[in-house]
């Protein structure tokens, strides 16, 4: 009943509708502009050969749902709470790092943007401020799923949160490897976080979450196979920053292991692949991240996205049961 109540609240419904409409309007404006500016995606040669035909598809499309979410937030919440503003900062801050990375890839005309050092410094600046905020205003305790208890990290909270932001943003970035995959999964993740935020009384935060979900639903029309636009690192890092910060505000960073199970699997597949090859000279998967493994097995992009989305739904229900 609480879930149903949150989804029929007029503010929640309006936020979803407005962000969907705004993103639907922005898409046909931004996509042709990206074409005109020749902001096309460079495809990795070592990736699946079927992806080579995607070269030139406009990237940096994450701007569509970033702008739509921001516009909706300020329409629906004239004076957002501090927690909603810090979630927006995380969303835009990480997205800006991704934007710089995408821009350099386009300028260089190859799939290499910021150097690892440059990217690390920028991400540390963004996550460093967020970690300071979390330590000072959110507190150092986090909830443990299924156990109905908390653990206080004390000073260890600082390195934990820094590692957490790096892990979540990179995990979402790895998931963005198929048309519509990161978009579909994150629609479900942000919807879950919106429901929990609402039920815990964080109304501004809930509006941010569902506004993002509505914008992503509209973006999916342009990003689903065959994609007319890619979100780029602009979008994937922004999404990682958003879900990471919202879960942290709710003191539920560990819940992302459940609702973000696809992010976790994608990341683990890369770690295991690299470790196995370095230790034994053999690969566990045909290709990593794991969505490419299923492509090599003959699965269509649409099938992979559908299956991964269903898995996310199942784990969202498991996450509800854990609270």
From Swiss-Prot:
This protein's name: Phospho-N-acetylmuramoyl-pentapeptide-transferase
Purpose of the protein: Catalyzes the initial step of the lipid cycle reactions in the biosynthesis of the cell wall peptidoglycan: transfers peptidoglycan precursor phospho-MurNAc-pentapeptide from UDP-MurNAc-pentapeptide onto the lipid carrier undecaprenyl phosphate, yielding undecaprenyl-pyrophosphoryl-MurNAc-pentapeptide, known as lipid I.
Entry's Gene Ontology BP terms: cell division; cell wall organization; peptidoglycan biosynthetic process; regulation of cell shape
The EC number(s) this enzyme carries: 2.7.8.13
GO-annotated cellular components: plasma membrane
Chief subcellular location: membrane
GO molecular function, one term: UDP-N-acetylmuramoyl-L-alanyl-D-glutamyl-meso-2,6-diaminopimelyl-D-alanyl-D-alanine:undecaprenyl-phosphate transferase activity
Keywords, comma-separated and alphabetical: Cell cycle, Cell division, Cell membrane, Cell shape, Cell wall biogenesis/degradation, Magnesium, Membrane, Metal-binding, Peptidoglycan synthesis, Transferase, Transmembrane, Transmembrane helix
Pfam entry (one): Glycos_transf_4
Membrane association type: Multi-pass membrane protein
UniProt-listed NCBIfam families: mraY
Transmembrane segments: 12-32, 58-78, 84-104, 120-140, 151-171, 177-197, 200-220, 229-250, 303-323
Cofactors: Mg(2+)
Family membership: Belongs to the glycosyltransferase 4 family. MraY subfamily.
Reaction equations catalysed: UDP-N-acetyl-alpha-D-muramoyl-L-alanyl-gamma-D-glutamyl-meso-2,6-diaminopimeloyl-D-alanyl-D-alanine + di-trans,octa-cis-undecaprenyl phosphate = di-trans,octa-cis-undecaprenyl diphospho-N-acetyl-alpha-D-muramoyl-L-alanyl-D-glutamyl-meso-2,6-diaminopimeloyl-D-alanyl-D-alanine + UMP
Compartments where located: Cell membrane
Pathway listed: Cell wall biogenesis; peptidoglycan biosynthesis
């Amino acid at each position: 009943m609480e879930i149903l109540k949150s989804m029929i609240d007029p503010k929640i419904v309006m936020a979803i509708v407005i962000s969907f409409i705004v993103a639907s309007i922005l898409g046909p404006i931004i996509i042709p502009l990206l074409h005109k500016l020749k902001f096309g995606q460079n495809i990795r040669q070592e990736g699946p050969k079927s992806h080579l035909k995607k070269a030139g598809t406009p990237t940096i499309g994450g701007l569509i749902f970033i702008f739509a979410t921001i516009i909706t937030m300020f329409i629906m919440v004239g004076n957002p709470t501090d927690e909603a503003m810090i979630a927006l900062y995380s969303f835009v801050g990480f997205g800006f790092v991704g934007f710089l990375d995408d821009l350099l890839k386009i300028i260089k005309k190859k799939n290499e943007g910021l150097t690892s050092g440059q990217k690390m410094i920028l991400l540390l600046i963004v996550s460093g401020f967020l970690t300071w905020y979390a330590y000072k205003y959110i507190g150092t305790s986090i909830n443990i799923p299924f156990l109905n208890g908390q653990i206080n990290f004390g000073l260890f909270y600082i390195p934990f949160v820094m590692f957490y932001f790096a892990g979540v943003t990179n995990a979402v970035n790895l998931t963005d490897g198929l048309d519509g995959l990161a978009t579909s999964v994150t629609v479900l993740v942000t919807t879950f976080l919106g429901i929990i935020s609402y039920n815990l009384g964080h109304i501004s935060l809930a509006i941010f979450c569902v506004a993002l979900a509505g914008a992503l639903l509209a973006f999916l029309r342009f990003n689903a196979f065959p994609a007319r636009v890619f979100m780029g690192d602009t979008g994937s890092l922004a999404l990682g920053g958003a879900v990471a910060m919202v879960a942290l505000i709710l003191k539920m960073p560990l819940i992302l292991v459940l609702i973000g199970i696809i992010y976790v699997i994608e990341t683990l597949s890369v770690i295991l692949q690299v470790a196995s090859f370095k230790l034994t000279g053999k690969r566990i998967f045909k290709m990593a991240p794991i969505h490419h493994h299923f492509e090599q097995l003959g699965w269509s992009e649409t099938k992979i996205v559908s299956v991964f989305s269903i898995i996310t739904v199942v784990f969202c229900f498991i996450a509800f049961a854990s609270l």
